[in-house]
Design a protein with these regions (language model features):
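Bacterial N-terminal signal peptides that target proteins for export
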Residues: 1-8
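Exposed, interaction-prone regions of secreted/extracellular proteins
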Residues: 25-246
Length: 246
């Protein structure tokens, strides 16, 4: 599955004062694209996934050195996505070039190929080692202003968005849980190091009845960069990190 990524809509950031990153992973940013490290649900698995949640440990990330634009970004996130990758909702943290606040919360959703993604970045500077619950959940209630059902993105218990569409009947099924670190350039570091990994703990899947269960085994691996790695301590507990800095 081609999983699209959350740097596509950054216009709201253009008013920020650009500052150089404190350090750079590699001096040459190399290839631009969708580079992931982590796990995602195999579409062949026959259980229903209506939402995704995990407690994620924030880790800093060094950005590559020769692309001074806000398209130079490193992230870690949870996601619920359509099986064709055209629609998704996600929440996590991000560090992008030029952000004076460093690593911040972010959320994004996209209805599908019809529409642009809607992105929100926080202003709170996040410290390495802090933990937050990032979740996307399907709901049917008054929070859905434009449809019967919608997806809601949360950081801990704070609602960051309720989608303006109902993915039920629109998104290709089965929907997929994803837990990933990501960069837009192969020269950047995915968040986390071997001594301080980005941990995804208490990973959960939202079932058809709206209740939650621990993430099941049988996830597919993403491993786009030989400098990065990921591991697990159980089906519902995973880590990602940059294993080689050069």
């Amino acid at each position: 599955m081609k999983r699209l990524s959350p740097w596509l809509v950054l216009a709201l950031l253009m008013s920020c004062m650009f500052v150089s990153p404190a350090s750079a992973a590699l001096p040459n940013c190399a290839y631009f694209g969708n580079w992931h490290e982590g796990v995602w649900k195999d579409p062949k698995l026959n259980y229903v996934s209506n939402g995704t949640s995990a407690i994620v440990t924030v880790r800093s990330s060094a950005l590559c050195g020769n692309q001074n634009s806000n398209n130079n970004i490193a992230l870690a996130w949870t996601m619920i996505a359509s099986t064709d990758g055209r629609g998704w909702a996600q929440a996590g943290f991000a560090n992008y070039w030029g952000n004076p606040n460093g690593t911040v919360h972010f959320t994004q959703y996209k209805q599908g190929s019809c529409c642009s993604a809607v992105t929100y970045f926080g202003s709170q500077h996040l410290l390495s080692g802090q933990k937050y619950q990032y979740s996307e959940r399907y709901i049917v209630n008054s929070y859905c202003l434009h449809s019967i059902g919608c997806l809601q993105g949360r950081v801990d218990n704070i609602i960051w968005f309720s989608t303006d569409f109902d993915p039920a009947g629109r998104w290709a099924t089965p929907w997929l849980n994803e837990y990933e670190g990501e960069t837009t350039y192969t020269g950047s570091d995915v968040p986390g190091l071997a001594t301080s990994k980005t941990a995804f703990q208490s990973m959960q899947n939202q079932k058809a009845d709206g209740t939650w269960e621990p993430q099941r085994c049988g996830m597919n691996d993403s491993h786009a960069n030989p400098r990065w790695d990921h591991g697990l301590t159980g089906c519902d507990s995973r880590q990602v990190w940059t294993a080689r800095l050069s």
